[in-house]
Amino acid sequence: MTPESRDTTDLSPRGTQEMEGIVVVKVEEEDEEDHFQKQRNKVESSPQVLSRSTTMNERALLSSYLVAYRVAKEKMAHTAAEKIILPACMDMVRTIFDDKSADKLRTIPLSDNTISRRICTIAKHLEAMLITRLQSGIDFAIQLDESTDIASCPTLLVYVRYVWQDDFVEDLLCCLNLNSHITGLDLFTELENCIVGQYKLNWKHCKGISSDGAANMTGKHSRLTEKLLEATHNNALWNHCFIHREALVSKEISPSLMDVLKKAVKIVNFIKGSSLNSRLLEILCSEIGVNHTHLLFHTEVRWLSQGKVLSRVYELRNEIYIFLIEKQSHLANIFENDIWVTKLAYLSDIFGILNELNLKIQGKNNDIFQYLEHILGFQKTLLFWQARLKSNRPSYYMFPTLLQHIEENIINEDCLKEIKLEILLHLTSLSQTFNYYFPEEKFESLKENIWMKDPFAFQNPASIIKLNLEPEEENELLQLSSSFTLKNYYKTLSLSAFWIKIKDEFPLLSRKSISLLLPFTTTYLCELGFSILTRLKTKKRNRLNSAPDMRVALSSCVPDWKELMNRQAHPSH
């Protein structure tokens, strides 16, 4: 076909189809151009491209930024760049290439003060990227928690979750170093000054707040959560951290079982409290040939420590008994009590099971439906176990350590009855406490919107009527559940990514789903952040201003190195 024939307009139906085809191709080409332009911008701002198109001084500056970025990401001391990284790089370059190439690395500024300034610059850059996104008017949710660092300085961490491009993004919003003896109202003032005053964000876009149930967050005198909800005009949903609630449930224990736990901890403290005792037990365990040779400490602030401590004490019970006899300790008498050892076996099982549940509700980017399934499933499991023990033929298969202990040891019927009653009382108490901390009425809205979890489960049109949706929403769900293409997307994408992907085609259902999935259900990210803080701020670095390092170490944004270099090349006057 000649160019002239392609330009000729055909008014026939066939020609109309060809014209429509041309328009479609043009739109696709525009989309492709936009896609490739984004990829080009991304490549142009990458360190690899920048290093090829700049002078030696600019390359040295970029290298300084890249090293500082890695130092912060790895939570290293700022002196590591000059004392470890640079000498190591020079050794490698000198070995593989020559001295002249290695000497070029000396032009890279890597002193501790320089690295500190670079990290501060990168942190401000990442903060600006995040705030620019949030200032666009998108909805967001926050989780917050407060703790103290090695220097006894209160620190407030706030994480944010928001919709960006094709999924939820979670990022550190702010790390605030606070004054001592700060109250809940003071915390709110600090947050208000930062989020509204400094970042210019509007609380009306905050759709979710998550915190633990500590007094400084929810106490009647602190009123932090209450003030935050007032600031959002009560449009935000407050979630008490699921992990914290589950940890509170595990603390409900009868006096008899608490006595077993306390004695186990006392034995551990007797051995671990002395380095000599620890070494002697290690030697004894090594000679006997057991898998583990050390006991573990228990601490109240570590959620998973109880189960691990009890399991290790039970596993090494014979070795500990021999050791205590050799030390002529009265604690050896504890292991001669069969009922105590049997209860120890049960506690190691039940706390191990609670630990597994705790781990299931940890992690990033988990939706509230997943948490609800884990909690409701465990509540049903507790009821089933109670029914199993009350039956004419009770079984202990759900507690493998206890079952093995009963099978391997001769335990009289009276002891078994006492232990069975103790277990039943504990399981009943756990069920009641779960119902208190996870009341069913709190999850009614989730059950009413169960279609969000799987919109393709309603193949029968009549089943959609029972969902109490608006007519427009019913029509969208009817069309959505009939799409095989979108069903394939549903299978491959996360739940949040799926609803974001179809927001233009099904706006009502998508908006409703995103608003329910957006709020945090735990403060896991804050706990993870405090763990990072303990690595950054040590006894030797107790005067460190941790906020910039925390920002770079935890940020989900990737620095735009091209923008950073341009800013450095054109400083403000």
UniProtKB/Swiss-Prot annotation:
Extracellular membrane side: 1-513
Membrane topology value: Single-pass membrane protein
UniProt-annotated stretches for the region Disordered: 1-51
Entry keyword set: Membrane, Transmembrane, Transmembrane helix
Subcellular location: Membrane
Gene Ontology cellular component list: membrane
TM ranges: 514-533
Superkingdom, natural source: Eukaryota
Chief place where the protein resides: membrane
Chain ranges on the Cytoplasmic side, renumbered to this chain: 534-573
Family: Belongs to the FAM200 family.
Record-given protein name: Protein FAM200A
Species of provenance: Macaca fascicularis
